[in-house]
């Protein structure tokens, strides 16, 4: 019942007879020898993670680390081959010049590259040889050839005319920016003198070239527009909700190995444990391990010394411990130097298409009108009732087929021509990877200073200031009147030295000491409402590029302004001195969002910038539902190239009766590309219209101006696949009278046709609303240091901080000049008796005094004598 079972011990033989019960327990035998050392036990589990330690005090800032090794620039991939330039027109043949004088021949120059072959001219008829005419005037100098190697120095000839400059050579390859380890921030040094402007840094890595679009027809270059006045700044929008936390960044590289730790002190001796039972003999001895450090001897029970066994195997590394608790955030570091200008960012992803406007009413066909002047864009009208279907049109004649030209031979690579106008957009590629952080743009114009916000809360208590230097002594006061002299008192005994007297009245106020250390910056107050825009100032001289301002909200697209004349370039302003970088204060809480300001006036169209790098293809947009096909009217004569008409409302035609199939017309030339607008917001899902019957092709019209592209709607639901209609091969019918049939019933839903090719890029859509603030992405790599911007405007004066704690007592000041004599004091009290003075010197013997008068007669035998005036009787 829970006890030990001793049945395994040898039992005494059972004798029959009267049993007297079990005998007394025997004495315990002698203690056996200690058993052999047992095998090493298995490795223990790792203990739980300790509590996070208290954050240590912030150590002093380390010295500035040495400059890292210069980064090695890796030559980037060769840029894509540029498009060949448009071959120039053949020049006019010049008149033959008079034979010039032979100059000293130079050495033969290197052979220039062969230019792209121009178009072959028509072969002229063979002319007859005419008589030699008189020498013509001297022709103009041709373009200079490529420079040859220097020839031997000839005699100085007459100064020739300067030839035109040769074409620019191809641009060199861009190297990759070097990457060195970022050293720890050092203490901010004193402001140095303004150095000369350094050389430009290495250009950033060029993005991968996009797919080249088809070449567009070069249009005329528009005149440069006037720069419009900046509109008033809009108020700050409402703050978006906090985004979801971004995904964890990639694991950083492992840090460098730490220094080898010192050997810790020996632990205290453990208390002696109870003697365990003798262990069984352990297993096979392990391989010789590395000898461990011998610890201090423990105080055990005295037993025979055991034989030291061989060292055990080196243990396997334990399982990784649990991740410790997150440490407290560190103090903010010093402000690092400003970064250099980073590489240009990749273009952003196109936004979602905007909503489809309501369909306008279908109008009757009018006569062909003359092109009117361009009006403003009209608003979309309400959808009208469905009108009756018009008559089917006549079948047009097929256009003549063009002749196929011969394939030209590829010429050598010509000098890259100027950038042509952008061609129509190709089909959208898949969404590219998110680009790196864009470069900091140029700073925005400095806005008018808004009204001061409400005072923020008091800042933290500042550190005690430095003790001021002692002040100078005040002016001497007027002298007091001398008092009456008192009687001389008795000299008292010398008293013991008294204690220090009470502290005197405070002296004159000293000069103000140096300014104390700047206290901690208080939290920023709530932002005040934006002030009204000030009047436009006169244009200043051009200053240095300031730091990048925050991106403003996009205003609505303004109408294109009239092209103006190009203004003269202003003079470059002087570079301001670098200001001292102040400590970074804590981030203040965001103020309430102000109301939206009125929309600013539309800005004029700015100058065209240089062509940018080819961006990655954007993500493919979703295809909207196909609209119903209208009935095609008879082809009219080709009109003149009309002016650009107003943007009409989007119509929704009725499904008409099917006309006979027409022949395929000639492919018209591509329209001029429209300018790309910002993406609109996604529209509602449109209904899937019934497919219309193919109409007759119209005659080839002249190239029109690009129309305004409507917003792409969301894709509609898939319709039920209808049976395909058979295609007829009828001959052209005769012109019948125009009938007016009733509206045909809608046909069954056809199968969804293949996706059409992308049309020309439409006009800019309406500006989409600002989306919510996206999740904070991982921090990109630090860009190169940018040029230091101009010194900013002085900030508002901060609130006075709390009074600092009293500083330590300063050193004693120099002794001031003696003050004026005070009034005579009252008679003092009798002093203590003075110490007994030393014995005086014995005086000299006095001279003999005069004889005294005769004494009375003596009494027998005596005589009288005088001594110093005293009478003695002998």
From Swiss-Prot:
This is Collagen alpha-2(I) chain. The keyword Glycoprotein applies. Residues 27-66, 110-143, 188-209, 218-236, 247-257, 346-365, 434-451, 463-473, 491-538, 545-565, 583-593, 614-623, 663-697, 705-724, 745-755, 763-778 have a biased composition (Low complexity). Expressed in bones. Its main location: secreted. GO terms for cellular component: extracellular matrix; extracellular space. The modification 5-hydroxylysine is found at residue 93. The modification Allysine is found at residue 16. Residues 566-575 have a biased composition (Basic and acidic residues). These protein fragments were extracted from an ancient pelvis bone collected in Newburgh, New York, USA and estimated to be around 11255 years old. It comes from the Eukaryota. It is found in: Secreted; Secreted, Extracellular space; Secreted, Extracellular space, Extracellular matrix. Keywords: Extinct organism protein, Extracellular matrix, Glycoprotein, Hydroxylation, Pyrrolidone carboxylic acid, Secreted. PANTHER family: COLLAGEN ALPHA, COLLAGEN TRIPLE HELIX REPEAT. Type I collagen is a member of group I collagen (fibrillar forming collagen).
């Amino acid at each position: 019942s829970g006890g030990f079972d001793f049945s395994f011990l040898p039992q005494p033989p059972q004798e029959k007879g009267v049993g007297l019960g079990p005998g007394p327990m025997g004495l315990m035998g002698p203690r056996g020898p200690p058993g052999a050392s047992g095998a090493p036990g298995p490795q223990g589990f790792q203990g739980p993670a300790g509590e996070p330690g208290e954050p240590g005090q912030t150590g002093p800032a380390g010295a500035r680390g040495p400059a890292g090794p210069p980064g090695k620039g890796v030559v980037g991939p060769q840029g894509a081959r540029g498009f060949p330039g448009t071959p120039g027109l053949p020049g006019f043949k010049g008149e033959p010049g008079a034979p010039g004088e032979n100059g000293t021949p130079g050495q033969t120059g290197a052979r220039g590259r062969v230019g792209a072959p121009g178009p072959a001219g028509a072969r002229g008829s063979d002319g007859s040889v005419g008589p030699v005419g008189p020498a013509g005037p001297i022709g103009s100098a041709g373009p200079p050839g490529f420079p040859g190697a220097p020839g031997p120095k000839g005699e100085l000839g007459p100064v020739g005319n300067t030839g035109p400059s040769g074409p620019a050579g191809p641009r060199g390859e861009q190297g990759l920016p070097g990457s060195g380890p970022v050293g720890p921030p050092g203490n901010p040094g004193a402001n140095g003198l303004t150095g000369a402007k350094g050389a430009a840094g290495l250009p950033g890595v060029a993005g991968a070239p996009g797919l080249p679009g088809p070449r567009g027809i070069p249009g005329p270059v528009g005149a440069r527009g006037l720069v419009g006045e900046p509109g008033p700044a809009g108020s700050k929008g409402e703050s978006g909700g906090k985004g979801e936390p971004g995904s964890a960044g990639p694991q950083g590289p492992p840090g460098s190995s730490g220094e080898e730790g010192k050997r810790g002190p020996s632990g205290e001796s453990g208390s002696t444990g109870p003697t365990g039972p003798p262990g069984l003999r352990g297993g096979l001895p392990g391989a010789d391990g590395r000898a461990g450090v011998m610890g201090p001897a423990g105080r055990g029970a005295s037993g025979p010394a055991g034989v030291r066994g061989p060292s055990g195997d080196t243990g396997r590394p334990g399982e990784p411990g649990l991740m410790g608790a997150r440490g407290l955030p560190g103090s903010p570091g010093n402000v690092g130097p400003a970064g250099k200008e980073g590489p240009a960012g990749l273009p952003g992803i196109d936004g979602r298409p905007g909503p489809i406007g309501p369909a306008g009413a279908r109008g009757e066909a009018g006569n062909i009108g003359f092109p009117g002047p361009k009006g403003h864009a009209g608003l979309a009208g309400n959808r009208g009732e469905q009108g009756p279907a018009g008559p089917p049109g006549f079948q047009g004649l097929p256009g003549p087929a063009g002749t196929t030209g011969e394939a030209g031979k590829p010429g050598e690579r010509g000098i890259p021509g100027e950038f042509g106008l952008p061609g129509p957009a190709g089909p959208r590629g898949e969404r590219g990877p998110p680009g790196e952080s864009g470069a900091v743009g140029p700073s925005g114009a400095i806005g008018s200073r808004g009204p001061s916000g409400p005072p923020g809360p008091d800042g933290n208590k500042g550190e005690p200031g430095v003790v001021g230097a002692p002040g100078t002594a005040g002016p001497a006061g007027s002298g007091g009147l001398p008092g009456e002299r008192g009687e001389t008192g008795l000299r008292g005994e010398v008293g013991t030295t008294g204690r220090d007297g009470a502290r005197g009245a405070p002296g004159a106020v000293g000069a103000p000491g140096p300014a104390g250390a700047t206290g901690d910056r208080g939290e920023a107050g709530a932002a005040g409402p934006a002030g009204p825009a000030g009047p436009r100032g006169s244009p200043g001289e051009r200053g240095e590029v300031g730091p990048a301002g925050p991106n403003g909200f996009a205003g609505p697209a303004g109408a294109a302004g009239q092209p103006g004349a190009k203004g003269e370039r202003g003079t470059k302003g002087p570079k301001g001195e670098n200001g001292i970088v102040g400590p970074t204060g804590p981030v203040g809480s965001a103020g309430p969002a102000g109301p939206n300001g009125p929309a600013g006036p539309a800005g004029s169209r700015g100058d065209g910038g240089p062509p940018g790098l080819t961006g990655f293809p954007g993500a493919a947009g979703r295809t909207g539902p196909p609209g119903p096909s209208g009935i095609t009217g008879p082809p009219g004569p080709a009109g003149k190239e009309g002016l650009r008409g107003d943007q009409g409302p989007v119509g929704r035609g009725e499904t008409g009766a099917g006309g006979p199939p027409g022949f395929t017309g000639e492919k018209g030339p591509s329209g001029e590309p429209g300018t790309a607008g910002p993406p609109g917001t996604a529209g509602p899902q449109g209904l899937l219209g019934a497919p219309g019957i193919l109409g007759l092709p119209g005659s080839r019209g002249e190239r029109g101006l690009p129309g305004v592209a409507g917003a792409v709607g969301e894709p509609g639901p898939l319709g039920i696949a209808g049976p395909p209609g058979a295609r007829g091969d009828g001959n052209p019918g005769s012109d019948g009278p125009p009938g007016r049939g009733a509206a045909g019933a809608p046909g069954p839903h056809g199968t969804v046709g293949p996706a059409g090719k992308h049309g020309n890029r439409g006009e800019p859509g309406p500006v989409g609303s600002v989306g919510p603030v996206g999740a904070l992405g991982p921090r990109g790599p630090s860009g190169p240091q940018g040029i230091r911007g101009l010194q900013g405007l002085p900030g508002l004066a901060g609130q006075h901080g709390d009074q600092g704690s009293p500083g330590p007592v300063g050193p004693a000041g120099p002794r001031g000049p003696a003050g004026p004599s005070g009034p005579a004091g009252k008679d003092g009290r009798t002093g203590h008796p003075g110490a007994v003075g030393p014995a005086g010197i014995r005086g000299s013997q006095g001279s003999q005094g005069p004889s005294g008068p005769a004494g009375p007669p003596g009494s027998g035998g005596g005589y009288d004598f005088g001594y110093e005036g005293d009478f003695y009787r002998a």
